[in-house]
From Swiss-Prot:
The chain crosses the membrane at residues 473-493, 495-515. It comes from the Eukaryota. Residues 130-186, 736-751 have a biased composition (Low complexity). One of its GO terms (molecular function) is lipid binding. Residues 817-1102 form the SMP-LTD domain. The keyword Nucleus applies. Glycans are attached at N593. PROSITE patterns: SMP. Its main location: endoplasmic reticulum. This is Testis-expressed protein 2. Keywords: Endoplasmic reticulum, Glycoprotein, Lipid transport, Lipid-binding, Membrane, Nucleus, Phosphoprotein, Transmembrane, Transmembrane helix, Transport.
Length: 1128
């Protein structure tokens, strides 16, 4: 504790005031609170102090200055020298601040008060402070001058007594309770000086208001440190508040009532019972303190209510920091905080924040009553509310466990500026924001999935079955029985109770014996089943299905060939089919990872599929060929008169504009007009023939065409003919384009407003029709498929450039999956296929299947047919390394299996080159091939349609794409290439034919030497031994939605295959590396064409029913327009 005499203060009045770091320790007007002011510059504060002194000049009496520092504060003031505004620079060397465990008792004069500190529970280590420090750290330098005088010249009356030992460092007590310092300026100025750099940026405030805000916050910061020693809640009575207070309390108080200093922070020390004033005087001073407290806190509460009204709509993303709430809590005004944890850190919703919110409410309720007596007029604080910011965004993690002064000094100016401008509104909003922060982690738990919710319901049902015994009821009955046996009841009463009890027990026994014991359980199971049945898979089919297909104008099985088709981009939206023709054809076969075609569209046709007939051609297709991509889907369009006539009226104006496809930006270029094509199509295209690029894609298109053809008839039943309401036009505009009219004005066959308004109804109700068909299927599959893997990202991704099954995302494998989980499947398959690998019967069956495939491979006409001479199916079957969880989407059930094969499958193929056929007519040889196949002159495609014979392989020359003609080239006439499906030989074979038909070659073959050599070569067999040593990849198994009888399988990406090809020429083995590598590469390409997605192979299952199955009672056969059973 330091005290300064008046002479020393008088001596220092005339000293200059340089700008230097300084500390002011100042007493308030009410003599209840001190404030410590630390300033690094000391310039801006002086002007403000002079302004503030003008407000304090009224009603000030002679007051003594008792200057001191809080005992519990860690005073780490690091200024290197400076002057007090009212005192000279200290010159005595500072040895550091000594720590005293005993109360610091210093000599005092008549106008000086003693301050006794209670013994410290723990020593607070203080860092040494240089002597060059401003007052408070030096013995000779004055600490502060009193602001209670009217001017600097009047400071003689508020004298400062010197220290008891001027030559020594000040002795600071390390007590846990804070000292009652007798200056109103110091601590008030501390925060103010730290915030002055930020304040000039904001709108200026009245001096009184600014002093009030700063003083309140700084006093709060000081008061919170007092509770360090109060580890338990302790609230001393008013009679005990006379401890450690000053005699100056007895001086007359100001009558102006404009004290804007901080409220009282009375010091209490339970361990010290000594008093330095009389009780009556203390009681009078307590009343004065209460009055001033009510005056001080009334205006902040009014400001708080105003801020809440203005800032109610503001957004604060972060919760309060703990220290901000504690410092802003009005409980600090009375000095009764019950918490000793003070820290400034970011709130993460921990338990620390819950306590301070409750403390704030408790202490605030205690101080609401004195505010009712306040009569201060509240000044407008609109400018204050406009400068508020979010405190949580910049609150640092500085720990202020003991509210050390060093921590306050090290804080940024901006942080304290925000603190004192937001302390009042944060007080009431902090608790609410904290609760919101704590509730955030609980929200995901509420949003549970359907499967989890149902499981919780089942758990609740099972819990009800195992309820606790009705203890109260049983106790009541036991008491009744006990009373019946003990109490002396009359005989008639006893007989009545006995009869009632026996009747009740008889009824219970009757119910027990004659009621089935499982009735209740059955009821529970039905309830659980009903809950489970309502859980269906969220299968969402895309509203728009688009992809590439092949179209032919007229289909005749006898003359059809793949080269007669042309590519079209198909877009199916509701019941509208849009066909866009590119300027050049793309590949007729979809392949893995194919590039996006760069095409422009030259024409477009739009059809309405309502009431159309969808079926497959040719008639009587064999079951195994239903989804063969070589056979088209036939769409016999319904009545298109109104539809096409409306399109024709708009065709001339929109012929050259492309379809609205986002994927193809180049479609706006090079669109030559073809005005006569639309007219011909309206008369010539009542039937469309479309080929799928893969078998799986063909089945998908067929199913969607069926749904589209029945869409309008389904809509007419519930909705009538109300599809052309004008109110539906905006909805359609959102689906198609910003302007519904522009979206269709670009098309070449459709542009009428009536048709645009009729389509939205189809779009809105298309989901209901699909849901009607898939309802039971979805519920059934919902019980079979794990619910946690039905997310949309697992679904196959539709590719507009290739097909709906062009590219699919592989589900990620859970890391916990291990091979042991599939061990039972591998063991079962291995045991079942034991006989398959070892018995000759099954080897012959497989050989026959392979031979049928080989017989359909198109070879040059001078080579004989491929034959299988050797087959070794190895010693193992494919093994499932990992099975991914199944999932269901709009294309059906998907199961992904990680497969591996190491069985050394081996087969040997043989053929011969018949060079004697060179130079002869290929057509004659083709006819001979027809005789060998016992097909006569019937085209191969027509003969195979209704037979179980294998069709040509995927790599046959029939499917090879010859050089595509441009848009202006004429398509070849049907049948121009002969009976063999219009097959055209390759360039190499045509070149060979030219050579063999030349006169020179014919003359050379007539010589005996060459004839002999040709016969030797023709009789030499060509052998090719192929061994599959290893195959590993992810196999996707797909079962489409019902009705279907197919299981489709294919690899997600090209598998790793290790092939060994060993060609032989007679008895010689060809060892040329280039030859063997070329053969192996061709075999891998052949495998990729058949088994790599989007190409998938299929297996039909007899127990499943397809749409063309006469046994089927599926919804696709109920509609009369779809006469697939009659056609097939």
């Amino acid at each position: 504790m330091t005290s300064l005499n008046g002479r020393h203060a008088e001596k220092t009045i005339d000293m200059p005031k340089p700008s230097a770091p300084k500390v002011h320790v100042q007493r308030s007007v009410s003599r209840d609170t001190i404030a410590i002011h630390f300033s690094a510059s000391g310039e801006e504060e002086e002007e403000e102090e002079e302004e503030f002194r003008g407000y304090l000049e009224e009603g000030l009496d002679d007051q003594s200055i008792v200057t001191g520092l809080e005992a519990k504060e860690d005073l780490y003031l690091e200024s290197q020298g400076g002057h007090d505004p009212a005192g000279p620079v200290s010159t005595a060397p500072a040895d550091g601040l000594s720590v005293s465990e005993s109360p610091a008792i210093l000599p005092v004069s008549e106008n000086t008060v003693k301050l006794l500190e209670s013994p410290a529970p723990a020593l607070q280590v203080l860092s040494p402070v240089p002597l060059a420090l401003s007052p408070g750290s030096s013995s000779s330098g004055p600490l502060a001058s009193s602001p209670s005088v009217s001017s600097l010249s009047e400071q003689k009356t508020s004298s400062s007594s010197p220290l008891s030992s001027p030559s020594k460092s000040p002795v600071l007590s390390s007590s846990a309770s804070s000292s009652a310092l007798s200056s109103a300026k110091p601590f008030m100025s501390l925060v103010k000086s730290l915030s002055t750099e930020v304040e000039p940026k904001e709108s200026p405030h009245p001096p009184r208001h600014r002093h009030l805000m700063k003083t309140l916050v700084k006093s709060l910061s000081t008061d919170t440190s007092r509770q360090e020693s109060d580890t338990v809640s302790y609230k001393p009575p008013d009679s005990k508040l006379n401890l450690h207070l000053f005699k100056q309390f007895t001086q007359p108080r100001n009558t102006g009532g404009d004290s804007k200093t901080a409220p009282s922070s009375p010091l209490t020390s339970p361990s010290d019972t000594r008093s330095f004033f009389k009780v009556p005087e203390m009681e009078a001073k307590i009343e004065d303190t209460k009055r001033r407290l009510s005056e001080v806190i009334y205006e902040p509460f009014q400001l708080l209510s105003k801020i809440i009204g203005e800032e109610s709509g503001s957004h604060r993303p972060k919760a309060l920091s703990a220290s901000a709430s504690e410092l802003s809590s009005l409980s600090g005004l009375n000095g009764h905080l019950e918490s000793n944890n003070y820290s400034i850190k970011e709130e993460e919703g921990d338990s620390e924040g819950e306590g301070y919110g409750s403390d704030s409410n408790t202490s605030r309720s205690d101080h609401l009553k004195p505010t009712e007596d306040a009569s201060k007029e509240v000044e407008p604080k609109g400018s204050q509310a406009s400068s508020l910011k979010d405190l949580g965004l910049k609150t640092s993690s500085l720990v202020l466990e003991k509210c050390s002064l060093s921590a306050l000094v090290s804080k940024e100016d901006e942080e304290f500026c925000e603190l004192y401008t937001e302390d009042f509104e944060l007080e009431t909003e902090g608790e609410g924001r904290l609760d919101k922060t704590l509730d955030l982690p609980l929200k995901p738990e509420v949003l549970a999935s359907d499967g989890v919710a149902l499981e919780s319901e089942d758990e609740e049902d099972s819990a009800t079955e195992h309820q606790e015994l009705p203890v109260k009821t049983l106790g009541f009955f036991i008491m009744c029985v006990y009373a019946y046996l003990i109490l002396p009841l009359p005989y008639y009463m006893s007989g009545l109770f006995l009869g009632v009890g026996l009747g009740f027990m008889t009824a219970v026994c009757m119910i027990w014996f004659f009621t089935p014991p499982s009735a209740h359980k059955h009821h529970k199971s039905l309830k659980a089943l009903r809950h489970q049945s309502t859980r269906s898979l969220d299968i969402k089919e895309p509203e728009i299905l688009k992809g590439w297909m092949n179209e032919i104008y007229n289909y005749d099985p006898e003359t059809y060939h793949a080269t007669l088709t042309h590519s079209v981009f198909v877009r199916l939206e509701g019941g509208t089919l849009r066909l866009s023709k590119p300027n050049k054809n793309i590949s007729r076969r979809a392949s893995y990872n194919e590039t996006k075609p760069e095409v422009t569209y030259i024409s477009q046709k739009i059809y309405d599929l309502s009431d159309s007939k969808i079926y497959l051609v040719p008639k009587s297709l064999a079951r195994k060929r239903i989804w063969n991509k070589k056979y088209p889907i036939c769409i016999e369009l319904g009545r298109q008169d109104d539809f096409m006539s409306k399109a024709q009226s708009d065709k001339e104006a929109t012929e050259e504009k492309p379809p609205p496809e986002k994927e193809l930006p180049s479609e706006d270029l090079k669109k030559p007009p073809q005005p006569q094509e639309g007219t011909k199509s309206s008369q010539r295209d009542p039937i469309l023939y479309l080929f799928g690029r893969t078998g799986r894609e063909k089945e998908e298109w067929f199913r969607r065409f069926i749904l589209a053809s029945r869409l309008k008839s389904e809509l007419r039943k519930p909705a009538g003919v109300s599809g052309s309401k004008s109110g539906l036009l905006p909805a359609h505009s959102r689906h198609s384009s910003p302007s519904g009219h522009l979206s269709h004005s670009r098309s070449s066959s459709k542009g009428s407003v009536e048709e645009m308004m009729s389509q939205p109804k189809q779009k809105e109700l298309v989901g209901s029709v699909r849901q009607k068909m898939l309802l039971d299927y979805s519920v059934y599959m919902g019980r079979c498929v794990p619910q946690d893997n039905r997310s949309p990202h697992r679904s196959p991704v539709q590719s507009a450039e290739s097909s709906p099954t062009a590219s699919k995302k592989l589900p990620e494998a859970p890391p916990s999956e291990e091979e042991e989980q599939e061990a039972w499947v591998n063991a079962l398959l291995g045991r079942i296929f034991w006989d398959f690998l070892g018995e000759k019967y099954w080897s012959d069956v497989v050989s026959k299947k392979i031979q049928m495939k080989l017989s359909k491979i198109k070879l040059p006409y001078f080579m004989n047919e491929l034959t299988l001479t050797e087959l070794d199916m190895g010693v193992a079957v494919p093994k499932i390394l990992q099975a991914f969880k199944p999932y269901v989407d709009h294309q059906g059930l998907w199961i992904d299996l990680e497969m591996s094969y190491n069985g050394s499958f081996l087969m040997t193929l043989e053929t011969k080159m018949n060079l004697t056929k060179l130079g002869k007519e290929p057509l004659v040889e083709a006819l001979k091939v027809g005789e060998i196949g016992k097909e006569g002159c019937r085209p191969r495609a027509y003969c195979l349609a209704d037979s179980d014979e294998e069709s040509s392989s995927a790599g046959s020359s029939e499917e090879d794409d010859p050089p595509e003609p441009t848009a202006g080239d004429k398509q070849p006439l049907p049948g121009a290439e002969g009976y063999v499906g219009g097959h055209r030989t390759s360039k190499i074979m045509r070149f060979v034919d030219k050579i063999t038909k030349s006169k020179y070659f014919q003359k050379a073959t007539e010589t005996e030497f060459i004839k002999k050599k040709i016969e030797e070569v023709s009789n030499t067999p060509l052998l090719l031994t192929v061994e599959v040593q290893e195959c590993r990849g992810t196999l996707a198994v797909n079962i489409p939605p019902p009705p279907t009888d197919r299981i489709w399988y294919g690899f997600r990406k090209p598998p790793y295959v290790e092939l060994k090809a060993r060609p032989k020429l007679g008895e010689r083995e060809v060892t040329l590396v280039h030859v063997t590598e070329w053969i192996e590469k061709k075999l891998e390409q052949e495998l990729q064409k058949v088994f790599v997605m989007p190409n998938m192979d299929d297996v039909y299952i007899p127990i499943m029913h397809s749409a063309m199955d006469p046994r089927s009672t599926s919804c696709l056969l109920k509609e009369p327009p779809v006469e697939t059973s009659d056609q097939l």
